[in-house]
Amino acid sequence: MKKMVKDARHEEEFEISSAATSDEVIGYDIYPPAKECLRKHDIPFQKRGARQVTDEDYSYYDHIFVMDWANLRDMKRRFGDEKGKIQMLMSLAGEEREIPDPWYTGDFESTYRDICTSLNKFLSESF
């Protein structure tokens, strides 16, 4: 998303972050096959340690996108979502479905395409 926003010259209008809903990956860097997919599509990234979503994230960010029903349920249970900030990423593209987790499927390309489809729709409606 950062690259899409930068390419559209709207960097000043967005602050983008990523966080896990569980604590099982906290501190881990980007999964190596995910890095390969990012490189293939010229998406810049840097070494980082995963972090868990915080109460401050819900207060601070205008939109919180999740990729599967379990994360949607967990996030809404945690935050209540009175402001309607939390939504399934594919719903942005008009599809009420999960984005398959490439950790389990091994299909990082399909996941990349789904994410791009959804974010392109979101960004086209935001500008």
Label each PLM-derived region with a short phrase.
Residues 1-60, 124-127:
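Conserved active-site segments centered on acidic
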Residues 63, 69-127:
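Phosphate-binding/catalytic loops
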